[in-house]
From Swiss-Prot:
Gene3D superfamilies for the chain: Aldolase class I
Keywords: 2Fe-2S, 4Fe-4S, Biotin biosynthesis, Iron, Iron-sulfur, Metal-binding, S-adenosyl-L-methionine, Transferase
Residues that hold [4Fe-4S] cluster according to the record: 92, 96, 99
Cofactor-binding details, from the entry: Binds 1 [4Fe-4S] cluster. The cluster is coordinated with 3 cysteines and an exchangeable S-adenosyl-L-methionine. Binds 1 [2Fe-2S] cluster. The cluster is coordinated with 3 cysteines and 1 arginine.
GO biological process: biotin biosynthetic process
This protein's name: Biotin synthase
Organism lineage: Bacteria, Bacillati, Actinomycetota, Actinomycetes, Micrococcales
NCBIfam families: bioB
Enzyme class: transferase
Pathway: Cofactor biosynthesis; biotin biosynthesis; biotin from 7,8-diaminononanoate: step 2/2
Binding site for [2Fe-2S] cluster: 135, 168, 227, 297
Length: 356
């Protein structure tokens, strides 16, 4: 009886060689990140981020573990909790293709103003969750005198009613408006880059990337903390995702909220597919390794993209802040669900620290 040996075919040999090369590359970028970011506190470069984002699925657990170690070493174990509310919803003149608040699209969102007593009530409810930050948001290109006056009145009433840091997100600002917000005690200002410079014209045409940067730089110069984030999953390439992380790292914001596209009816991106959960987790780890000391916050779209299990994995993969409750035009997880998860993971909520 003749026994035939299983001789690998040419294709099998090629596949095995490819897997070995991929494993070696994965080990190399992870070891580089461990030495450069974890040990020395220096973020990955754009080229290194591209390599990291190409890690295969089997390397994802190790990547998330490394990002978690970086977060613990360079940021500590505390998790910052924030609530947000819109003082003006809808009717925005800008054409951000992902946003249902644009007045240029056939979106179901309609213009609504929130009165000051409701704003104060929301601030109290946010503080009751243990949150240290309350962000007032308006869907505008830039605030007019009426809105600025309302913001000043709202800040005064909130400060009288509850002890919480106040942040604002009011679009692009003039130097005078930046100075006013700083004088009124605004702790942090949010103005997102959203996507990479090279992809920005594909998702926004009514203003430029440079205009966004100008506001960000003025905010930093005025002494307010800059919150400047990303919206990923809009059709950008892996390379553009790395580009965005590197551009944010160069800007050095205090906080980076990570949003994942939740396609909204009536917007140009309504038919864009949902980002793969593993790609989202890879991005979370990559942004942490690009910015080892930055507050990296879970923001919109995580419920749809990651679900409950993915939310947990992200908190163990570089995230150290969350927005609790609902977002501007979409529903979030109940605050109790996120707070219970933090307790389960033994992650203490950061205590309130008034900085301004």
């Amino acid at each position: 009886m003749t026994i035939q040996a299983n001789v690998p075919t040419g294709d099998e040999t090629s596949d095995e060689a490819s897997r070995q090369t991929s494993n070696e590359a994965s080990s190399e970028i992870l070891e580089t990140a461990r030495q450069q970011v974890l040990e020395n506190g220096v973020g990955l470069t754009q080229a290194q981020l591209e390599e990291f984002l190409r890690l295969p699925d089997e390397a994802l657990p190790a990547a998330l573990q490394l990002a978690h170690e970086v977060r613990l070493k360079h940021c500590g174990e505390d998790v910052e909790v924030e609530g947000i509310i819109s003082i003006k919803t809808g009717g925005c003149p800008e054409d951000c293709h992902f946003c249902s608040q644009s007045g240029l699209f056939d979106s179901p969102v309609r213009g609504v103003w929130l009165d000051i007593p409701e704003l104060v009530k929301a601030a109290k409810e946010t503080a009751a969750t243990g949150a240290t930050e309350f962000c007032i948001v308006a869907a505008v290109r830039c605030p007019d005198i009426k809105l600025m006056n309302q913001i000043k009145f709202a800040i005064d009433r909130i400060n009288e009613a509850v002890d919480i840091n106040i942040a604002c997100s009011l679009g692009m600002l003039t130097q005078r408006q930046v100075d006013q917000l700083a004088e009124w005690g605004v702790h942090r200002y949010n103005h997102n880059l959203e996507t990479a410079r090279s992809y920005f014209p594909e998702v926004v045409t009514t203003h430029s990337y440079e205009e966004r940067l100008e506001t960000c730089n003025m905010v930093k110069a005025a002494g307010m903390e800059l919150c400047c984030g990303a919206l990923i999953g809009m059709g950008e390439t892996l390379e553009q995702r790395a580009e965005l992380a590197a551009q944010l790292a160069a800007l050095e914001p205090h906080e980076v909220p990570l949003n994942f596209l939740n396609p909204r009816p009536g917007t140009p991106l309504e038919n864009q597919g949902i980002m793969d959960g593993k790609d989202a987790l890879r991005a979370i780890a990559a942004f942490r390794l690009a910015m080892p000391r930055t507050v990296l916050r879970y923001a919109g779209g995580r419920e749809l993209t990651l679900g409950d299990l993915g939310t947990r994995e992200g908190l163990l993969g570089g995230i150290n802040a969350v927005i609790v409750g609902n977002y501007l035009t979409t529903l979030g997880r109940p605050a109790t669900a996120d707070l219970s998860l933090l307790v389960e993971l033994n992650m203490p909520i950061k205590e309130l620290q008034k900085t301004l």
